[in-house]
């Protein structure tokens, strides 16, 4: 079996996690108490969904997940919510004291008291796996727990499970909407460690997802639940091929192989289609060609950055539902002819496709319409550098005056860490610039000879 362990850190990670597990349970027909009426082979661990759930002798399905937060309120909602019987109580780990939006508290003072307990729980989950494939880590980089404790845990996972892939779903600060004043500090410090300790990072940003909810689903005032359910669809599409059988399955390590040209250039942009409300769905065809075109629309990107300002290096299309390879090939051929979608000249093919026959499931009473087919795109584009340069600019404005820095230094950080992290990000922006630059200078000499 190729098991995957999910780790949900802090408020953002926990709430996205709730939406994901709610959706997984619906997709597999698992009830909130963990029973699965359709699963006849009790305790027989070879079904595809066992990558995400372990089965007890009593036929209960337990998610291979850990929820961690430095303060209890958010995880207490899981402990008392609909799915309280689904999780083993040991999988929900909380501290007593908040990280207070402070990276240093999450990473040094408070984080280090709880990190060994967390790794111990992860170790227990890993011991139940026959062939652990890797980790999915969910957190935000703007808060204190997600950024500080998230980085700490990723660093420790690298030490303990060096070769296992770590895929990271990180909520980045939005351009306009801010939840904390010190977001730029936390994000820069956290990205510094994401660069080193994750294999692929998927960027999400609340503002972009708000806009999609407003525009495509006609929700006037989207709540975090609306946002998280949309994100859950994306994550579910990524992991469908691990949990169901399909025509063109995609393994976790395949994402890395196909999307990451250089180790540092591993920040992906996600988009999903069709995002459509039930009223509209009746009047639209939503063919494979249509949904393929819409995942390339800048307005459908889940992070605020415009892919037209950059070039694509690689792109992964995960289809699910009623889709055949012939339609996919035709749609991709059309995309390749479009002038607006530019690839770097050193990556001529650039598309990885996956197809899974399990149609998308929707949460009853949710906003999305039930559709026959959907596609999720993960793309590696040089435009994502916009996200970093935006955060870096805000960081510089604050750091020039050393504003708020004493809170971090007081928790045992050194000022040098700020400048080190900032330099690392400056180097990352430069890397993106160079990757997108025309490679014609290098190839200039050879062409004259032929």
Curated annotation (Swiss-Prot):
Residues the record lists as N6-acetyllysine modifications: 40
Pfam families linked: Tubulin, Tubulin_C
Residues binding Mg(2+), per UniProt: 71
Transmembrane segments: none
InterPro entries on file: Alpha_tubulin, Tub_FtsZ_C, Tubulin, Tubulin/FtsZ-like_C, Tubulin/FtsZ_2-layer-sand-dom, Tubulin/FtsZ_GTPase_sf, Tubulin_C, Tubulin_CS
One of the record's GO cellular component terms: microtubule
Ligand binding (GTP): 11, 71, 140, 144-145, 179, 206, 228
Domain of life (superkingdom): Eukaryota
Record's keyword annotation contains Transcription: no
Keyword line: Acetylation, Cytoplasm, Cytoskeleton, GTP-binding, Hydrolase, Magnesium, Metal-binding, Microtubule, Nucleotide-binding, Nucleus
PROSITE patterns, A to Z: TUBULIN
Catalytic residues, chain numbering: 254
CDD domains named in the record: alpha_tubulin
Residue ranges of the region described as Disordered: 430-450
Catalytic reaction list: GTP + H2O = GDP + phosphate + H(+)
GO biological process terms held by the UniProt record: microtubule-based process
Protein's UniProt keywords contain Acetylation: yes
Family as reported in the entry's similarity comment: Belongs to the tubulin family.
Assembly mode: Dimer of alpha and beta chains. A typical microtubule is a hollow water-filled tube with an outer diameter of 25 nm and an inner diameter of 15 nM. Alpha-beta heterodimers associate head-to-tail to form protofilaments running lengthwise along the microtubule wall with the beta-tubulin subunit facing the microtubule plus end conferring a structural polarity. Microtubules usually have 13 protofilaments but different protofilament numbers can be found in some organisms and specialized cells.
UniProt name for this protein: Tubulin alpha-1A chain
Gene: ALTA
